[in-house]
Amino acid sequence: MILKRFFRLSGLKIALLSILAVSVIYYLDPDFLSLLELKTLDLRFHSRGKIVTTGEVALVAIDEKSLDELGRWPWPRVRMAQLLDALVKYEAKVVGFDIVWAEPDENSELKSLSALKQKMNELKLTNRDLEKYLSQAIQKADTDRTLADSLARSRRAVLGYFFHFFTKEDLPKEKKQLPKDLPPLSTYNWVKYSSQAAAKVPLFEATYAEVNIPVIAEAAEGAGYFNIFPDRDGTVRWIPLVIKYQDKHYCALSLAVLQKFLNNSPLVLRLAEFGVEEIRLGDLFIPTNEEGRMLINYRGPQKTFPHYSATDVIHGRVPAKAFKGKIVLVGATAMGIYDIRVTPFDHVFPGLEVHANVIDTILKQQFLYRPNWVTLFDLLAIIVLGLILGIILPKVKALWGGLDRDFSFFRLRPDLQSIIPETRDLGEPDVSSIQSCPYLSDDHRLSIHD
Protein backbone atom coordinates (compact mmCIF):
# COMPACT_ATOMS: atom_id res chain seq x y z
CA MET A 1 0.00 0.00 0.00
CA ILE A 2 2.83 2.35 0.90
CA LEU A 3 4.66 1.46 -2.31
CA LYS A 4 1.51 2.12 -4.35
CA ARG A 5 1.18 5.54 -2.76
CA PHE A 6 4.85 6.24 -3.37
CA PHE A 7 4.67 5.36 -7.07
CA ARG A 8 1.26 6.95 -7.61
CA LEU A 9 1.72 10.05 -9.77
CA SER A 10 0.51 13.35 -8.47
CA GLY A 11 0.85 16.91 -9.63
CA LEU A 12 3.66 17.58 -7.17
CA LYS A 13 5.60 14.45 -8.15
CA ILE A 14 5.22 15.22 -11.85
CA ALA A 15 6.41 18.76 -11.18
CA LEU A 16 9.47 17.58 -9.22
CA LEU A 17 10.36 15.00 -11.86
CA SER A 18 9.99 17.61 -14.60
CA ILE A 19 12.16 20.07 -12.68
CA LEU A 20 14.83 17.39 -12.15
CA ALA A 21 14.78 16.28 -15.79
CA VAL A 22 14.96 19.80 -17.22
CA SER A 23 17.70 20.77 -14.73
CA VAL A 24 19.79 17.79 -15.84
CA ILE A 25 19.27 18.73 -19.50
CA TYR A 26 20.22 22.32 -18.69
CA TYR A 27 23.42 21.16 -16.98
CA LEU A 28 24.41 18.71 -19.72
CA ASP A 29 23.69 21.26 -22.46
CA PRO A 30 23.15 18.70 -25.25
CA ASP A 31 24.22 19.61 -28.76
CA PHE A 32 20.75 19.77 -30.25
CA LEU A 33 19.61 22.34 -27.67
CA SER A 34 22.78 24.41 -28.09
CA LEU A 35 22.31 24.43 -31.85
CA LEU A 36 18.68 25.42 -31.40
CA GLU A 37 19.75 28.34 -29.21
CA LEU A 38 22.27 29.47 -31.82
CA LYS A 39 19.69 29.31 -34.59
CA THR A 40 17.20 31.37 -32.59
CA LEU A 41 19.92 34.00 -32.18
CA ASP A 42 20.38 34.03 -35.97
CA LEU A 43 16.63 34.48 -36.42
CA ARG A 44 16.71 37.48 -34.13
CA PHE A 45 19.47 39.06 -36.21
CA HIS A 46 17.41 38.60 -39.36
CA SER A 47 14.32 40.01 -37.67
CA ARG A 48 16.20 43.04 -36.36
CA GLY A 49 17.81 43.70 -39.72
CA LYS A 50 20.50 46.22 -40.56
CA ILE A 51 21.48 48.89 -38.02
CA VAL A 52 23.37 52.15 -38.39
CA THR A 53 27.17 52.02 -38.04
CA THR A 54 29.43 54.63 -36.48
CA GLY A 55 30.73 55.64 -39.90
CA GLU A 56 34.30 55.36 -38.59
CA VAL A 57 35.24 52.21 -40.51
CA ALA A 58 35.84 51.73 -44.24
CA LEU A 59 37.13 48.73 -46.18
CA VAL A 60 39.62 48.64 -49.04
CA ALA A 61 39.07 45.43 -50.93
CA ILE A 62 41.51 43.53 -53.10
CA ASP A 63 38.65 42.45 -55.34
CA GLU A 64 38.18 41.07 -58.85
CA LYS A 65 38.44 44.55 -60.33
CA SER A 66 41.79 45.10 -58.62
CA LEU A 67 43.15 41.77 -59.83
CA ASP A 68 42.00 42.49 -63.40
CA GLU A 69 43.77 45.87 -63.45
CA LEU A 70 46.84 45.21 -61.31
CA GLY A 71 47.58 41.52 -61.72
CA ARG A 72 47.04 38.27 -59.88
CA TRP A 73 47.44 37.75 -56.16
CA PRO A 74 49.74 37.80 -54.24
CA TRP A 75 50.84 41.25 -55.23
CA PRO A 76 54.47 42.37 -55.01
CA ARG A 77 55.29 44.32 -51.88
CA VAL A 78 55.83 47.44 -54.01
CA ARG A 79 52.13 47.39 -54.93
CA MET A 80 51.11 47.18 -51.28
CA ALA A 81 53.44 50.09 -50.52
CA GLN A 82 51.70 52.10 -53.25
CA LEU A 83 48.34 51.30 -51.67
CA LEU A 84 49.47 52.39 -48.21
CA ASP A 85 51.02 55.59 -49.57
CA ALA A 86 47.72 56.39 -51.29
CA LEU A 87 45.78 55.87 -48.04
CA VAL A 88 48.19 58.22 -46.27
CA LYS A 89 47.41 60.87 -48.89
CA TYR A 90 43.70 60.26 -48.26
CA GLU A 91 44.44 60.99 -44.55
CA ALA A 92 43.25 57.69 -43.12
CA LYS A 93 43.89 57.72 -39.37
CA VAL A 94 44.68 54.00 -39.02
CA VAL A 95 45.26 51.32 -41.65
CA GLY A 96 44.81 47.72 -40.56
CA PHE A 97 45.97 44.85 -42.78
CA ASP A 98 44.08 41.57 -42.71
CA ILE A 99 47.16 40.12 -44.39
CA VAL A 100 50.36 38.47 -43.17
CA TRP A 101 53.73 38.68 -44.91
CA ALA A 102 55.35 35.64 -43.34
CA GLU A 103 57.93 34.99 -46.08
CA PRO A 104 60.32 37.26 -48.01
CA ASP A 105 59.04 38.47 -51.35
CA GLU A 106 60.06 36.28 -54.29
CA ASN A 107 62.30 38.55 -56.32
CA SER A 108 64.52 37.16 -59.08
CA GLU A 109 66.13 40.55 -59.75
CA LEU A 110 67.23 40.87 -56.13
CA LYS A 111 68.63 37.35 -56.15
CA SER A 112 70.64 38.02 -59.33
CA LEU A 113 72.08 41.29 -58.05
CA SER A 114 72.96 39.78 -54.67
CA ALA A 115 74.63 36.83 -56.38
CA LEU A 116 76.66 39.19 -58.60
CA LYS A 117 77.85 41.22 -55.61
CA GLN A 118 78.78 38.05 -53.74
CA LYS A 119 80.74 36.79 -56.75
CA MET A 120 82.66 40.05 -56.97
CA ASN A 121 83.62 39.71 -53.32
CA GLU A 122 84.75 36.12 -53.84
CA LEU A 123 86.90 37.13 -56.83
CA LYS A 124 88.16 40.18 -54.91
CA LEU A 125 87.15 42.49 -57.73
CA THR A 126 87.08 46.13 -56.65
CA ASN A 127 85.34 48.89 -58.51
CA ARG A 128 83.85 51.63 -56.36
CA ASP A 129 81.45 52.88 -59.01
CA LEU A 130 80.20 49.36 -59.74
CA GLU A 131 79.88 48.56 -56.02
CA LYS A 132 77.89 51.76 -55.46
CA TYR A 133 75.62 50.98 -58.40
CA LEU A 134 75.03 47.41 -57.20
CA SER A 135 74.21 48.59 -53.67
CA GLN A 136 71.67 51.09 -54.99
CA ALA A 137 70.17 48.52 -57.37
CA ILE A 138 69.88 45.94 -54.57
CA GLN A 139 68.20 48.48 -52.30
CA LYS A 140 65.74 49.40 -55.06
CA ALA A 141 65.02 45.75 -55.86
CA ASP A 142 64.42 44.86 -52.19
CA THR A 143 60.62 45.06 -52.21
CA ASP A 144 60.38 43.97 -48.57
CA ARG A 145 62.41 47.02 -47.62
CA THR A 146 60.24 49.19 -49.88
CA LEU A 147 57.10 48.10 -48.00
CA ALA A 148 58.86 48.48 -44.64
CA ASP A 149 59.87 52.05 -45.52
CA SER A 150 56.28 52.84 -46.47
CA LEU A 151 55.01 51.38 -43.18
CA ALA A 152 57.52 53.38 -41.17
CA ARG A 153 56.71 56.63 -42.98
CA SER A 154 52.97 56.21 -42.51
CA ARG A 155 53.13 55.78 -38.70
CA ARG A 156 49.56 54.45 -38.82
CA ALA A 157 49.77 50.84 -40.01
CA VAL A 158 48.73 47.83 -37.93
CA LEU A 159 49.60 44.39 -39.30
CA GLY A 160 47.88 41.05 -39.00
CA TYR A 161 49.22 37.61 -38.15
CA PHE A 162 47.75 34.36 -36.90
CA PHE A 163 48.29 31.58 -34.40
CA HIS A 164 48.27 27.81 -34.84
CA PHE A 165 46.92 25.49 -32.17
CA PHE A 166 48.84 22.31 -32.89
CA THR A 167 49.10 19.58 -30.30
CA LYS A 168 52.58 18.86 -29.00
CA GLU A 169 52.79 15.83 -31.27
CA ASP A 170 51.89 17.84 -34.38
CA LEU A 171 54.25 20.75 -33.72
CA PRO A 172 56.75 21.45 -36.52
CA LYS A 173 60.30 20.35 -35.81
CA GLU A 174 61.53 23.90 -35.93
CA LYS A 175 59.04 25.87 -33.89
CA LYS A 176 58.86 29.46 -35.02
CA GLN A 177 59.34 31.95 -32.20
CA LEU A 178 57.78 35.38 -32.02
CA PRO A 179 60.48 38.02 -32.51
CA LYS A 180 61.54 39.59 -29.23
CA ASP A 181 61.01 43.02 -30.74
CA LEU A 182 57.47 42.33 -31.94
CA PRO A 183 55.57 45.64 -31.67
CA PRO A 184 54.33 45.98 -28.07
CA LEU A 185 50.82 46.91 -29.15
CA SER A 186 50.27 43.26 -29.94
CA THR A 187 50.02 42.47 -26.24
CA TYR A 188 47.85 43.77 -23.41
CA ASN A 189 49.52 46.68 -21.66
CA TRP A 190 48.42 45.38 -18.26
CA VAL A 191 47.22 41.98 -17.13
CA LYS A 192 45.74 42.07 -13.63
CA TYR A 193 44.95 38.98 -11.55
CA SER A 194 42.37 38.87 -8.79
CA SER A 195 44.32 36.08 -7.05
CA GLN A 196 47.16 33.62 -7.57
CA ALA A 197 44.68 31.07 -8.91
CA ALA A 198 43.60 33.55 -11.58
CA ALA A 199 47.07 33.34 -13.15
CA LYS A 200 46.39 29.69 -14.00
CA VAL A 201 42.98 30.03 -15.65
CA PRO A 202 42.73 28.19 -18.98
CA LEU A 203 42.54 30.52 -21.98
CA PHE A 204 43.01 29.94 -25.68
CA GLU A 205 46.69 28.98 -25.75
CA ALA A 206 48.57 28.85 -29.04
CA THR A 207 51.57 26.66 -29.80
CA TYR A 208 52.83 28.23 -33.02
CA ALA A 209 52.79 31.75 -34.45
CA GLU A 210 52.79 32.75 -38.11
CA VAL A 211 54.13 36.30 -37.95
CA ASN A 212 55.39 38.89 -40.41
CA ILE A 213 59.05 38.84 -41.38
CA PRO A 214 61.15 41.04 -39.06
CA VAL A 215 61.92 43.82 -41.55
CA ILE A 216 58.18 44.41 -42.05
CA ALA A 217 57.03 43.73 -38.46
CA GLU A 218 59.50 46.22 -37.00
CA ALA A 219 58.29 49.02 -39.28
CA ALA A 220 54.62 48.85 -38.24
CA GLU A 221 52.89 50.54 -35.31
CA GLY A 222 51.43 47.29 -34.04
CA ALA A 223 50.15 43.86 -34.91
CA GLY A 224 47.11 41.79 -33.96
CA TYR A 225 46.07 38.24 -34.74
CA PHE A 226 43.09 37.57 -36.99
CA ASN A 227 42.14 34.11 -35.68
CA ILE A 228 38.40 33.45 -35.63
CA PHE A 229 36.78 30.30 -34.24
CA PRO A 230 33.35 29.37 -35.65
CA ASP A 231 30.64 27.73 -33.55
CA ARG A 232 29.85 24.04 -33.91
CA ASP A 233 27.50 24.73 -36.82
CA GLY A 234 30.24 26.60 -38.70
CA THR A 235 28.83 30.09 -38.10
CA VAL A 236 31.02 32.90 -36.76
CA ARG A 237 29.25 34.58 -33.84
CA TRP A 238 32.13 35.14 -31.44
CA ILE A 239 35.68 36.46 -31.68
CA PRO A 240 38.49 35.70 -29.20
CA LEU A 241 39.93 38.95 -27.88
CA VAL A 242 42.81 37.33 -26.00
CA ILE A 243 45.13 34.44 -26.87
CA LYS A 244 47.96 33.29 -24.66
CA TYR A 245 51.30 32.42 -26.21
CA GLN A 246 54.59 31.83 -24.41
CA ASP A 247 53.26 33.35 -21.17
CA LYS A 248 52.09 36.55 -22.86
CA HIS A 249 48.57 37.69 -23.66
CA TYR A 250 48.04 38.88 -27.21
CA CYS A 251 45.14 40.89 -28.59
CA ALA A 252 43.08 40.57 -31.76
CA LEU A 253 43.66 42.68 -34.86
CA SER A 254 40.46 44.60 -34.19
CA LEU A 255 41.70 45.63 -30.72
CA ALA A 256 45.17 46.55 -31.99
CA VAL A 257 43.60 48.77 -34.68
CA LEU A 258 41.23 50.37 -32.17
CA GLN A 259 44.04 51.05 -29.75
CA LYS A 260 45.93 52.98 -32.41
CA PHE A 261 42.72 54.79 -33.43
CA LEU A 262 42.16 55.86 -29.80
CA ASN A 263 45.65 57.34 -29.54
CA ASN A 264 47.25 54.29 -27.93
CA SER A 265 44.82 54.06 -25.01
CA PRO A 266 45.90 51.41 -22.48
CA LEU A 267 44.58 47.92 -23.07
CA VAL A 268 43.80 46.15 -19.78
CA LEU A 269 42.93 42.51 -19.15
CA ARG A 270 41.53 41.42 -15.77
CA LEU A 271 41.54 37.73 -14.90
CA ALA A 272 39.63 36.04 -12.07
CA GLU A 273 39.46 32.41 -10.92
CA PHE A 274 36.66 31.65 -13.39
CA GLY A 275 38.39 33.25 -16.40
CA VAL A 276 38.30 36.67 -18.06
CA GLU A 277 36.60 39.17 -15.78
CA GLU A 278 36.99 42.31 -17.83
CA ILE A 279 38.67 43.85 -20.85
CA ARG A 280 39.06 47.60 -21.11
CA LEU A 281 40.47 49.81 -23.82
CA GLY A 282 40.92 53.22 -22.29
CA ASP A 283 37.43 54.21 -21.12
CA LEU A 284 35.73 51.55 -23.24
CA PHE A 285 34.42 48.45 -21.49
CA ILE A 286 34.28 45.23 -23.53
CA PRO A 287 32.14 42.40 -22.08
CA THR A 288 33.26 38.86 -22.89
CA ASN A 289 32.62 35.34 -21.66
CA GLU A 290 35.06 33.59 -19.34
CA GLU A 291 37.21 32.52 -22.32
CA GLY A 292 37.64 36.11 -23.45
CA ARG A 293 35.33 35.77 -26.46
CA MET A 294 33.06 38.63 -27.49
CA LEU A 295 29.67 38.02 -29.10
CA ILE A 296 29.67 40.03 -32.33
CA ASN A 297 26.77 42.40 -32.81
CA TYR A 298 26.65 42.24 -36.60
CA ARG A 299 25.50 45.50 -38.11
CA GLY A 300 23.96 43.76 -41.10
CA PRO A 301 24.76 41.62 -44.15
CA GLN A 302 27.95 42.00 -46.16
CA LYS A 303 28.75 45.44 -47.59
CA THR A 304 27.05 47.14 -44.65
CA PHE A 305 30.34 49.05 -44.39
CA PRO A 306 31.58 51.14 -47.34
CA HIS A 307 33.79 49.12 -49.71
CA TYR A 308 36.37 50.63 -52.06
CA SER A 309 38.40 48.77 -54.65
CA ALA A 310 42.15 48.79 -54.01
CA THR A 311 42.86 49.71 -57.62
CA ASP A 312 40.59 52.76 -57.33
CA VAL A 313 42.49 53.87 -54.22
CA ILE A 314 45.88 53.48 -55.92
CA HIS A 315 44.71 55.37 -59.02
CA GLY A 316 43.04 58.17 -57.03
CA ARG A 317 39.50 57.38 -58.13
CA VAL A 318 38.00 57.52 -54.62
CA PRO A 319 36.23 60.62 -53.15
CA ALA A 320 38.69 62.89 -51.36
CA LYS A 321 37.11 62.53 -47.89
CA ALA A 322 36.29 58.82 -48.10
CA PHE A 323 38.98 57.82 -45.57
CA LYS A 324 39.78 61.06 -43.76
CA GLY A 325 40.19 60.43 -40.03
CA LYS A 326 38.83 56.89 -40.31
CA ILE A 327 39.87 53.32 -39.67
CA VAL A 328 40.64 51.61 -42.97
CA LEU A 329 40.86 47.82 -43.13
CA VAL A 330 42.68 46.29 -46.10
CA GLY A 331 42.15 42.72 -47.19
CA ALA A 332 41.17 40.35 -49.97
CA THR A 333 37.56 39.89 -51.06
CA ALA A 334 38.09 38.43 -54.54
CA MET A 335 36.70 34.95 -55.00
CA GLY A 336 39.31 32.28 -54.44
CA ILE A 337 41.79 34.35 -52.39
CA TYR A 338 39.81 35.46 -49.33
CA ASP A 339 38.68 33.67 -46.20
CA ILE A 340 34.99 32.86 -46.52
CA ARG A 341 33.01 33.02 -43.29
CA VAL A 342 29.46 32.04 -42.42
CA THR A 343 27.62 34.61 -40.31
CA PRO A 344 24.02 34.94 -39.06
CA PHE A 345 23.29 37.16 -42.07
CA ASP A 346 25.21 35.47 -44.90
CA HIS A 347 26.63 32.08 -45.82
CA VAL A 348 29.37 33.83 -47.81
CA PHE A 349 30.89 36.67 -45.80
CA PRO A 350 34.44 38.09 -46.08
CA GLY A 351 36.55 37.73 -42.95
CA LEU A 352 37.71 41.32 -43.45
CA GLU A 353 34.20 42.58 -42.70
CA VAL A 354 33.98 40.48 -39.53
CA HIS A 355 36.77 42.64 -38.07
CA ALA A 356 34.88 45.76 -39.15
CA ASN A 357 31.81 44.57 -37.23
CA VAL A 358 33.89 43.91 -34.11
CA ILE A 359 35.48 47.37 -34.24
CA ASP A 360 32.16 49.12 -34.82
CA THR A 361 30.48 47.19 -31.99
CA ILE A 362 33.17 48.26 -29.52
CA LEU A 363 33.21 51.88 -30.68
CA LYS A 364 29.44 52.13 -30.37
CA GLN A 365 29.42 50.19 -27.06
CA GLN A 366 26.44 48.21 -28.32
CA PHE A 367 27.18 44.73 -27.08
CA LEU A 368 25.38 41.43 -27.00
CA TYR A 369 26.16 39.63 -23.80
CA ARG A 370 24.75 37.26 -21.24
CA PRO A 371 24.78 38.67 -17.70
CA ASN A 372 26.23 36.46 -14.98
CA TRP A 373 22.87 36.28 -13.18
CA VAL A 374 21.09 34.64 -16.13
CA THR A 375 22.11 31.10 -15.10
CA LEU A 376 20.56 31.59 -11.66
CA PHE A 377 17.46 33.11 -13.24
CA ASP A 378 17.13 30.11 -15.57
CA LEU A 379 17.31 27.64 -12.68
CA LEU A 380 14.73 29.60 -10.69
CA ALA A 381 12.49 29.74 -13.76
CA ILE A 382 12.75 25.97 -14.17
CA ILE A 383 11.75 25.41 -10.53
CA VAL A 384 8.95 27.98 -10.33
CA LEU A 385 7.38 27.18 -13.68
CA GLY A 386 7.68 23.46 -13.05
CA LEU A 387 5.79 23.83 -9.76
CA ILE A 388 3.15 26.04 -11.37
CA LEU A 389 2.55 23.60 -14.22
CA GLY A 390 2.57 20.57 -11.95
CA ILE A 391 0.41 21.86 -9.08
CA ILE A 392 -1.75 24.81 -10.10
CA LEU A 393 -2.68 24.08 -13.69
CA PRO A 394 -4.06 20.56 -13.05
CA LYS A 395 -6.59 22.14 -10.67
CA VAL A 396 -7.88 24.50 -13.31
CA LYS A 397 -10.67 23.30 -15.55
CA ALA A 398 -9.49 22.06 -18.92
CA LEU A 399 -11.38 24.73 -20.84
CA TRP A 400 -10.15 27.63 -18.79
CA GLY A 401 -6.65 26.12 -18.71
CA GLY A 402 -6.56 25.98 -22.48
CA LEU A 403 -7.84 29.54 -22.81
CA ASP A 404 -5.34 30.76 -20.26
CA ARG A 405 -2.42 29.12 -22.07
CA ASP A 406 -3.52 30.53 -25.41
CA PHE A 407 -3.87 33.97 -23.88
CA SER A 408 -0.46 33.69 -22.21
CA PHE A 409 1.10 32.78 -25.54
CA PHE A 410 -0.12 35.94 -27.25
CA ARG A 411 0.46 38.11 -24.20
CA LEU A 412 4.02 36.95 -23.48
CA ARG A 413 5.20 36.39 -27.04
CA PRO A 414 5.35 39.73 -28.82
CA ASP A 415 6.36 39.74 -32.45
CA LEU A 416 10.06 39.41 -33.16
CA GLN A 417 10.37 43.04 -34.18
CA SER A 418 9.44 44.14 -30.67
CA ILE A 419 11.79 41.59 -29.11
CA ILE A 420 14.72 43.12 -30.92
CA PRO A 421 14.29 46.87 -31.36
CA GLU A 422 17.33 48.69 -32.64
CA THR A 423 18.19 50.15 -29.25
CA ARG A 424 18.26 46.80 -27.44
CA ASP A 425 20.86 44.11 -27.33
CA LEU A 426 20.44 40.46 -28.12
CA GLY A 427 20.99 37.78 -25.52
CA GLU A 428 21.24 34.06 -26.07
CA PRO A 429 17.82 32.43 -25.56
CA ASP A 430 18.12 29.39 -23.33
CA VAL A 431 15.94 26.64 -24.74
CA SER A 432 16.28 24.28 -21.80
CA SER A 433 14.70 26.71 -19.34
CA ILE A 434 11.84 27.29 -21.75
CA GLN A 435 11.10 23.56 -21.83
CA SER A 436 9.41 23.67 -18.46
CA CYS A 437 6.91 26.19 -19.83
CA PRO A 438 6.23 26.19 -23.57
CA TYR A 439 4.85 29.72 -23.48
CA LEU A 440 7.59 31.46 -21.53
CA SER A 441 8.78 34.58 -23.29
CA ASP A 442 12.56 34.86 -23.55
CA ASP A 443 12.57 38.64 -23.16
CA HIS A 444 14.44 38.21 -19.87
CA ARG A 445 17.55 37.29 -21.84
CA LEU A 446 17.76 40.64 -23.59
CA SER A 447 20.39 42.87 -22.04
CA ILE A 448 21.01 46.55 -22.63
CA HIS A 449 24.44 48.14 -22.34
CA ASP A 450 24.32 51.76 -23.46
Where are these regions (language model features)?
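Substrate-access "cap/lid" subdomains that shape
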Residues: 271-318
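Non-transmembrane functional regions of envelope-associated proteins
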Residues: 2-284, 320-410
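Transmembrane helix-loop junctions at the membrane interface of multipass transporters and ion channels
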Residues: 413-428
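Juxtamembrane or sensor-core-proximal signal-transducing alpha helices
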Residues: 434-450
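Helix N-cap / beta->alpha transition motif
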Residues: 254, 308-311, 426-428
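C-terminal, active-site-flanking charged/polar segments
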Residues: 353, 358, 432-439
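Membrane-embedded hydrophobic alpha-helical segments
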Residues: 17, 429-434
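Small-residue-enriched core segments of transmembrane alpha-helices in multipass membrane transport
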Residues: 403-415, 432-437
